[in-house]
A protein has these predicted regions:
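C-terminal peripheral helix-coil segments that are non-catalytic and often amphipathic
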Residues: 1, 96, 100, 131-140, ...
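Basic, helix-initiating cap at the start of DNA-binding domains
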Residues: 1-27, 32-42, 56-60, 65
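Residues at secondary-structure transition points
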Residues: 3-11, 53-57, 61, 65, ...
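Helix-turn-helix/winged-helix DNA-binding modules
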Residues: 26-29, 50, 170
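Short hydrophobic/aromatic patch on the recognition helix
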Residues: 41-52
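Hydrophobic alpha-helical connector segments
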Residues: 61, 75-100, 153-156
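Amphipathic alpha-helical packing segments from all-alpha helical-bundle domains
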Residues: 65-71, 117-142, 150-154, 177-180, ...
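Short secondary-structure transition hinges
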Residues: 95-135, 165-167
Length: 196
């Protein structure tokens, strides 16, 4: 008979994932052992393996959870408003997620090659879904640019994906202002960005 699940199973699993994101973000996946993860969680390696069959599964879970939050934000942003309003809402949601989950975002950007093929395929499929949403918005805003919407989409992500490294919630630039600036820059070029 299978052992019943502990009442705090989800809480413990989430704590392991938070520690994994923090350690993988700081030391890299290859530079972190399961013993390091267990120590950070103040638990045993065997308990880590109770929640995750392998170290690879912890990496996959960190990435999948972060991508699921991004997919949910994209889906929510697509519900109302014009294409430009949806792009602004999506950009703001993404920036908030990037800053609020710095470690997970860093892991997603830097550790993809460490996933086993099967898990990498799943993560890349989620990334492509998010890219497709933004590409659709750009195409809706500027249908005349249809032949180059994918490169424009990738430029857009190049502009916002690294904000987690420098944007601080307590800083002079709010996520809201930066999201608007990014969309203005994307849609109207540098001439549209104001200093105020």
């Amino acid at each position: 008979m299978a052992r019943p699940q502990s009442p705090d199973y989800d809480k413990r699993r989430d704590a392991i994932l938070a520690a994994a994101a923090r350690l993988y973000g700081k030391r890299g996946f290859q530079g972190t052992s399961v013993a390091d993860l267990a120590k950070a969680c103040r638990t045993s390696k065997s308990l880590i393996y109770h929640y995750f069959p392998s170290k690879d599964d912890t990496l996959h879970a960190v990435m999948a959870a972060h991508l699921d939050a991004l997919v949910d934000a994209a889906d929510e942003a697509m519900q109302t408003g014009s294409a430009e309003e949806r792009l602004r809402a999506l950009t703001l949601s993404f920036m908030r997620l990037y800053v609020g989950a710095r470690d997970s975002h860093k892991v997603l950007l830097n550790e993809l090659e460490n996933l086993p093929d099967r898990q990498r395929v799943e993560v890349v499929a989620k990334q492509r879904r998010i890219i497709a949403v933004v590409e659709t918005l750009i195409r809706d805003i500027r249908p005349d640019l249809n032949p180059i919407t994918l490169p424009l989409t990738m430029l857009f992500f190049g502009m916002i994906n690294w904000t987690h490294t420098w944007l601080r919630p307590e800083g002079r630039m709010s996520a809201e202002k930066l999201a608007d600036m990014a969309v203005d820059l994307m849609l109207h070029g540098l001439g549209s960005v104001r200093a105020d």
